[in-house]
Amino acid sequence: QKKETKFLFLGSKNGPERKMVEQAKIPFAAIPSGKLRRYWSWFNFIDPLFILGGGIAGLMHLLHFRPHVVVSAGSFVSVPVAYAAWFLRIPHIILQMDLRPGLANRLMAPVSNALVFYFESTANQFPTISKKRKIGPVVRQEIYSAKAERANERFGLHPERPLILITGGGQGALGLNKAVFPLLKHLLIDFQVVHLTGTGGENYLKPESSCFSHQDYHPIETVQQGMGDLLAKSDIVLTRAGMGILGELAIMQKDTILIPLPGTHQEDNARFIQENNAAEFVSQDVLAEQGLEWWKKYWKLRVPGKMGKRLHEILQDGGTNDFAKLLFEITDNR
């Protein structure tokens, strides 16, 4: 980061990103956003008004902030902002992390100057963009300085007992909580467990589970500080298959079990990574209905560290620096 670099994050008013961005002390501005649906809904008649409003709001924020470059990673909020950037002749970059491009990124492609991607097969799906660059995962700086010892202190963990981390992200936490619930007591036989339940998730699980009284079970709604340390401490991570968390796990070479959010691009991510022997993939339904049987098979065949190393081979280090270099390359050439 250059000393003079300034940032503005444009997002939805009530989205999960707002809290994280504000805690990182990055200026945040909310803009209206419609949902780009592929299916029939009465809201399809209303959403164009929100999209238009998002375009006007995006235009006003860009006029005021005067950025040298705009970066989008595929949210619905991004589309009107990308077109506002095109209107103002501000370079726009798409960060395509997932294997399968979403509708938002496809709609932004005609007005984008560059594409940054993780998987080779993704590049061919954006024929209108001439400048393309494959990089490794873009991750938080704290991943590189993470220490397991700090996680022991912060979260009250036993320094010697192995750890399983369960995390479902924002929208995907509730379904994962329900699926993993029957398996918890069996995991606690050999492991301590940190379970990121999501907001309100602990209230759902507590009346049902005797695990809450177990000394090695640590339910936490969200982690605002120390997530890198927690990942460093973990021996196995059960997670959704979003590329944000997967990139961090790849850098740390962690053995990972993927439970993708059903019916989403995460299933494509998980399937590709499993086919390359870089993580295990189990559906949410199978985990809920046959979790113990599945776990026994997994545990019998597991070779500690093998899949974590393979994940790192697929998603190699250096992406954060490469992405920053591209941004400055584009801004310096304006």
Task: Put a short name on every predicted segment.
Residues S72-A73, M227-D268:
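A donor-sugar binding/catalytic signature common to diverse glycosyltransferases
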Residues K297, Q316-R334:
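C-terminal alpha-helical cap of glycosyltransferases
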Residues M20-A24, A148-E153, L157-I236, L246, ...:
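Donor-nucleotide binding loops and adjacent catalytic segments primarily
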Residues W40-V69:
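An amphipathic, basic-hydrophobic alpha-helix
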Residues G15-K19, G58, P67-L88:
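An aromatic- and histidine-rich active-site surface loop
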